[in-house]
Amino acid sequence: GMLRYAALTGDTTLIPRVEKRWKLYKEYGMTENYENYNWFERYDTWTEPCAIVDSYLLATQLWAATRNPTYLEDADKIYLNVIAATQRHNGGFGCDKPVGVVYPELGIHADEAYWCCTMRGGEGLGRAAEYAYFTEGNRIVVPFYRESRLQLPDRNVVLEQRTDYPFGDRIEFRFAEKPDKEVSLALVVPSYMQLRSLTLNGHPVEANVSAGFAEVAGPFSAGDRIELEYGFAARWVPLENRDIADRTLYKAMY
């Protein structure tokens, strides 16, 4: 609500208040696999895709408001580890046991909450598609990697993206048409991603990463291909909930 009010009124003094609440949520309300505890300090309950989707929306919108790449990484982890995992075999969404303070491993609490979570899960998937691209003037920002096709008729941009992210090791963009205006691509590079190479039509592009993005400048022609090769390294990460007293515990991330 505060972010929406700030966007409508231009009152940016509200944004730090949202950031403070997000920090509180991450420290006490988020599970170790980026789901949610259904109540603060009630760690033996269950997770809720409704709240999970809200956290994904909020993290993305906080990034859009502040351009702090940490929020974008939060959103990426929520989508890949949670939204993509709480969707059940029939397409609906259900509740899990919250991993962290009480439960050491992931398990299903309710297979599907069709009267509630499935609806919000659908909204989350719709927003994931909406958030696949942002534009800033003639700059096309790619904050998440999705198999997709972007069309901007006002500048004759038709951009196709091919990827198995986070699986595989390549992301390919292809301009199907020559843009009417010179555009640039800003490709997200999370801190946990190893950027191995960036090429334009097979030729290396200098990959200077700033604020979590690598920039590829135009002009582009029909058929131009931008390819990003990446990898991940397995690592141990300290547990994040502040009510976990044992600081010798870690979780494996990849």
Residue ranges of each PLM-predicted region?
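Glycan-recognition and catalytic cores of secretory/periplasmic carbohydrate-active enzymes
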Residues: 1-254
